[in-house]
């Protein structure tokens, strides 16, 4: 056969080589009926062919070359497992891919013609031959694998044995069931596409490249077997029967014909039963038809061929009955089946146990496989092992106490654990399972890839040190578990987000990052660790950029440095890594050929120009201008900043609190960073690292959630940034700027001592709970809110209380309140009284002045406490109140000036000193209805003084019914101003010309109810006064100590309720006199009580002491006497008349006498009529304050209660050998003989005196006293009262006595 050769420049060898130009073609007639007569050409895709008639044809009429390459390389939108993928075409329309999780093409080798099937095996086409460069030497990631043997089957299926376990992928471990009929295959492997279930397969390869555009083919014959140009598509399986699978490469618009060089590449189908991708076969050839159609032919998966080769290179070692398996001089002994034929075989151990090397063991291409969930110990002094690697399958654990050969790399796969306990002095490559580093500098370097492996530290200095600490995270990375150890890095050599630094130990780790130049970490950080970046001095160009993610509840600490958190520019395939180069002299450079990258870019220049998307063809993995960025989530406890810069860039979601000192914080930074080597950072054989960082402007959405505490710092929130301050914001000497386009929401309150500049949106709300109800939040700005742009918006709603002046010269917007809000939106965690005091019953309260003459304000359900002259262009007020008041720095009257006012159902409360007042001036237009004017009197009005004080002015022809006068409760009075409307030539005015005042009965009643608390506390002490003496009549002891605890609740009208816990302790002694027994004693008491009503609540703590005596005559008569003093500390909060919270002390005295007669019906039963009289003294109190500018006072004088009680008790005793129990019940009537004290109220309407009232009630009780032995007694009593204005709802009395 004639062979034609030509000289070609080789990019691989860098010189000239001889290349055969011979092309092979086989022609035949199609089988079948004559009407389907066709001419076909069958071409083995591994043969070199000069013609492009059979070359790859990526159809780029409406798709980009990069789409096909992203497809095969799992880049861009084509991530493994992704669903609902839509490709945006050049014309702007989209193509939705079949409805199936996108395949993981990692089993496909770099050159595309072989596919890993797990372990040290791969598949290809037989016609590629063993010596073909893509078969003899196979590459995945940064690793090179040599073929050592292969096995083939008809027609063209081959499986290779490699010299190492492949660590970059688990491989395509299963094939399709080729015995199925086409219909059965459709059911099992079919997927939905465009509304129909079809037998669709996915493929990837890197054969000779050409592109087809609008029917015209452009060849790039010099491009083949280039890993960067790996490309793919999905195809339709037309024929499943027979010994070949035929696919239609052109059945859809996203078509890419399999090409020369694609021979052996795998065809993947989705197994709907196993929910995974499996291999249907490998490319054998292509059929080209006379009508231009094209089919690819695939040799079917052959499991028998695979198993035969695996069996050839496997040796099973059952250690179930062996204590130790010994390997010496290449011979295995001690397992009951000793052999010397183990060279190049995988030794597959089962049963667990010890493996002893008595000499170094070079197993060639064979590895050590541990095949069950057992523990194995590999020992051997200083002997070494060399081979394909270690495979810890099925959760097995291997304790590695030998060394690996230092001239080779140890490959580790399998989901189990390799526990390395000796320094290895070599490199590790791992892709699966766990490797424990249990020695200092366990490995020289570690290459971790595929995302399924973990390396765990288990010794100090377990990593080798150096700039990267000897660990390199290649494609899809893996996990480094610090395991409680601290670790420092200058740079972490990570190529993508699959790299993870974590700490799974309960002992916290510290991860220190000490880069000395700008550096991007593409990976993730999580677990129980703190992150530190501390420098002695601050300098530029030493920025740490995180574009992967952080997930920890711990802290990050920065000192004298810069940190950026941002998203990651989505990586895409490139045509070539690096620029075009030619080493030949100038006269011979034509031999180097053309720059194929420039040629490919030229084919798509028109689409790029039309769509403005140069990033599609710029041969860069990413570009600042591209629209697709991956969002990074950064979650931490607190970020501590000291003299540092922190920025949140595009596509970042940051969750955590910030504490800053002398630092700069930017949220929504427009500066972004990309790495032109991202995804390809790891170089050489896996132990090198590179980065090429480009910075520039690029904006995308930014999210921040958390709180900020900052001192002497700056905060800038930029366009497209959304900040949710869910925790408190504290800004001391810190200027905050919200730029145009920024959206900021605060929920938990804020304090600032500096101006807050707003060009974007600031919303202040209450703090929501899980039911979306709100706790009130306070926003206090000691400076001002500056609205610096026409688009600026200041919003407050949902229980926000805002304090601070507002200034603007722009057409900004102020929106306060929520028209659907009411108290029902309060969180159940909130005191309604507190909310009422803070918000005044409105949705929002605002205290401050507004100087914004060009701005518009909307107030719904808002209480505006206006503290200074204010101006607005427009104000719309609904269901709100404008309350003119003073501030610490401004005691003057104020004027609110508005060009246009639309007001409905609102109130305007103004102050007057009877000669001047606050004013509302409307310049251009006033409209509305149902609005009221209220007037606070700073001085007491006198009826004889004539008033004429202008309150409101508006343009003439304004409806005079916009405002009307309304009564206002001030203090204890209802004050109704007399408002007179007058119209002149240019305006209409509403003026105060008088007032009407009447007492407010409800406020008066509330004041009396509050002051009656002391009487009710006195009454509770009375009810507990004589309890001790009643006990004495049921005991016979001489002397003793006793204790009593009583708890009760009471109620009265007006929503009043109280509860108390009263504790008494004391001692007493019995004196036997002629005809009577006399007991004398001393007691001390402590009482905790609380009381509440509709308009007040509070608590009282009381302590007291007293003396008592009880005389019991032998005839059954008795008399009890007691004297007692009690001191009370009170704290009460009232919501009427602006009283607020008051702390005050009072005291009371008690003198009581009770007489009665115990008549014994039988020896063990008795009836006891009784009468009691208690006289006392209760100290008075006085409060003085101002309500809405009016002076008020409340006072009650000392008074002397006198309370009587009559009643009868009955009882019966039950006794045994050494015990006695007395049961009793009582019924009584208690009544006041003197009225309670008088309360005096004073306000603008004068003085009001409220006389005290008498009360009475019926008392009921039941109880038990028990005597155990001679000296221990205890009792229990239950009480209740009825028919009184105040009643004891229930009370429990427990006592204990010890006699001595």
Swiss-Prot record:
Residues 1034-1300 form the Autotransporter domain. Residues 57-311 form the Peptidase S6 domain. One of its GO terms (molecular function) is serine-type endopeptidase activity. Its EC number is 3.4.21.-. The signal peptide, cleaved at the inner membrane, guides the autotransporter protein to the periplasmic space. Then, insertion of the C-terminal translocator domain in the outer membrane forms a hydrophilic pore for the translocation of the passenger domain to the bacterial cell surface, with subsequent cleavage. Serine protease with cytotoxic effect. Disrupts actin cytoskeleton resulting cell detachment in vitro. This is Serine protease EspP. It comes from Escherichia coli.
